[in-house]
Amino acid sequence: MCISISQVSRLRIHSFGSSCCERVHGWIKNSSSLKLLDVRASSVDGKARWIRRNVSTTTQGSRSNTKSSVLGGTVPVTRIIDEESRTKVQPFGNLQQRLAQDKDLSKLLTVIVSDLETTGLHRKNERIIEIAAQDIAGGGYSTFQTLVNPGVVPITNAHIHGIRNDMVCRPEVPRMEELIPIFLRYVESRQKPGGYVMLVAHNGKSFDFQFLINEFNRCSYEIPHNWLLLDSLPLARENMKSVEPTVKLSSSLEALADYYSLTREGDAHRALSDVLLLSKVFQKLTIDLKLSLSDLVLRCHTASDISAAMAKNKKA
DNA sequence: GGCCCTCTTTAGGGCCTT
């Protein structure tokens, strides 16, 4: 079951509530960010009406016959996915059991795996064009995915992810300043009362977290102080080194998926596909390295740590 | 950019992220 925010609005929110889990229903029903989407939709033709915000991936020319077929032709701009209903399985059972055994931290911590697609590799000049995240505990409405409108910044690496300017530079695709409060609401909906969030990304310290911090700063937001940032790449390197000390095995997400014989859903270098894969890889890594939740917390960074390093580098 | 490795440490190349 896959629910897009635009579909929620189209269906009338109050009648939709009974089918949602309570937390997500609560923030959707009361969300000011949803009003933002409505205003934006209304501004397209000056009429106040709900619209479905889909972006067609059907393309003409060099790319994407393959991609379009894989993605099913269209994808919603922003959506929260009921992964539990979609997969009919508990994909992270082992980690859930381990979290449950850690009685103190498991009551406080929400682990969310994330991935970004961007207009390029430069941390300062490029922009985010797609975000996906998944609460590793699974359950209903645990997954978030959205395209992001980068404004005037051109996409020069569409050959990597297949996302082109004409797909995201559209009025119905939210800009980052509109999206941040929506993303914050999603994270809050997964958060335990008075708890902390561990955001996991592959090569996050050098890439994803720097992009997020820059975008939050640009839009006059701060990364919440109860967020911990965990880079899964050092875990992968440590694990692969322990597997084969004399030969340097690749620690890329793709190589890890091959090593663990994991199947990818969707296309590589699309945020949701990478998040679903990293969620599985992350679980395998924590098991192989015998890392407790406490161990993981000790390996986390804070946004202020990374911001300070970025500022130091900027001066240098 | 940050990290790791080595033919290193007063450095440089490769990996990983898009």
From Swiss-Prot:
Residues 1-63 form a transit peptide. Gene3D superfamilies: Ribonuclease H-like superfamily/Ribonuclease H. Mg(2+) 1 binds at D115, E117, D274. The active site is at H269 (proton donor/acceptor). One of its GO terms (cellular component) is plastid. Highly expressed in mature pollen grains. Detected in flowers, senescing leaves and roots. Its main location: plastid. Disruption phenotype: No visible phenotype. Changing G204S: In dpd1-2; loss of activity. Inhibited by free nucleotide diphosphates (NDPs). It is found in: Plastid, Chloroplast; Mitochondrion. One of its GO terms (molecular function) is exonuclease activity. The keyword Repeat does not apply. It holds the Pfam family RNase_T. The keyword Nucleotidyltransferase does not apply. Changing R123W: In dpd1-3; loss of activity. Its EC number is 3.1.11.-. Transmembrane segments: none annotated. Keywords: Chloroplast, Exonuclease, Hydrolase, Magnesium, Metal-binding, Mitochondrion, Nuclease, Plastid, Transit peptide. Its cofactor is Mg(2+). Exonuclease required for organelle DNA degradation during pollen development. Plays non-essential roles in maternal inheritance. May be part of the DNA salvage machinery. DPD1 homologs are present in flowering plants but not in moss, green algae and animals. Belongs to the exonuclease superfamily. TREX family. This is Exonuclease DPD1, chloroplastic/mitochondrial. It comes from Arabidopsis thaliana.
